[in-house]
A protein has these predicted regions:
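Non-globular, low-confidence helical/coil segments that flank catalytic cores
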Residues: 1-255
């Protein structure tokens, strides 16, 4: 009975969650009846991120995904999408174009089979999904990790910044081009890589919580210097490899 009550309470609570998908990323946002997901990738070969994401949504009483945004087409951010589409209706998918990429083509084929609307990001976009707002910042040129969609997700007055795998060079562009006031939570870029979450970004974003989506890896992530930078700027750091799935429940005042 307590579990049912907790689920009912959970279902009616605006929430941003960073799922424990190992060395990958999958973020969900619930507000009212709206369900948004950013990325769905990895867990290595132990399981599929799509299975894990579907199970999580089901446990929260969510029966559809209104919007799925893919920051880029690396497997650790997107390889769970085909499986997820087999289990959940996804109304709209927004992603950057990566013609010739095998996973990109597989996702488009799956979207066509399941009647998911596909929007290819050609530039910055503003998206509203019920009580969830999103600003998508399209960086579509440059090196491999420089081609991505960064996003600012808003529920009421609560804002979270998702920087994908953006390196410091791209973070500097973002800071110079966009307002960073009011961002409370940072989803740390590139699983805590030493090449992301630089001083310019951390100095511009006056947030209090940093979440690192990371699992066992051979890349030294999260890097010690990144953890030290976050601490120096006063961030409380949570990480999925130590804390599991991280749920941020937003108060009734949406802040």
């Amino acid at each position: 009975t307590l579990l049912i009550l907790n689920r009912q309470f959970y279902r009616n609570t605006d929430t941003v969650s960073v799922l424990d998908v190992g060395q990958g990323q999958c973020i969900t946002a619930f507000a009212g009846d709206a369900t948004v997901m950013i990325d769905c990738g990895n867990t290595y070969n132990l399981s599929d991120a799509g299975d894990l994401a579907a199970a999580y949504l089901h446990s929260c009483g969510r029966d559809r995904i209104d919007l799925l945004v893919l920051t880029h087409l690396h497997e650790d951010h997107a390889d769970g999408v085909p499986r997820l589409m087999e289990m959940y209706d996804i109304e709209t998918l927004i992603l950057p174009e990566e013609r010739g990429d095998t996973l990109y083509e597989e996702i488009l084929d799956s979207a066509a089979r399941h009647a998911t609307e596909v929007i290819t990001a050609k530039g910055d976009m503003t998206v509203t999904c019920g009580d969830i707002g999103m600003e998508l910042y399209a960086y579509l040129n440059g090196g491999e990790n420089e081609r991505c969609l960064m996003s600012r997700l808003s529920i009421g007055s609560y804002d979270v910044l998702v920087t994908a795998d953006a390196p410091e060079k791209l973070e500097k562009r973002f800071v110079n081009e966009h307002d960073t006031d009011g961002i409370e939570t940072l989803i740390v870029g590139h699983h805590g890589s030493k090449y992301s979450s630089g001083d310019e970004l951390l100095g511009a974003v006056d947030g209090s919580l940093a979440v690192i989506s990371v699992g066992y890896n051979n890349y030294g992530q999260p890097a010690q210097e990144t953890l030290e930078r976050l601490a120096a700027y006063g961030y409380n750091v949570l990480r999925t490899d130590e804390d599991g799935t991280i749920e941020i429940r937003i108060g009734q005042d949406n802040g």
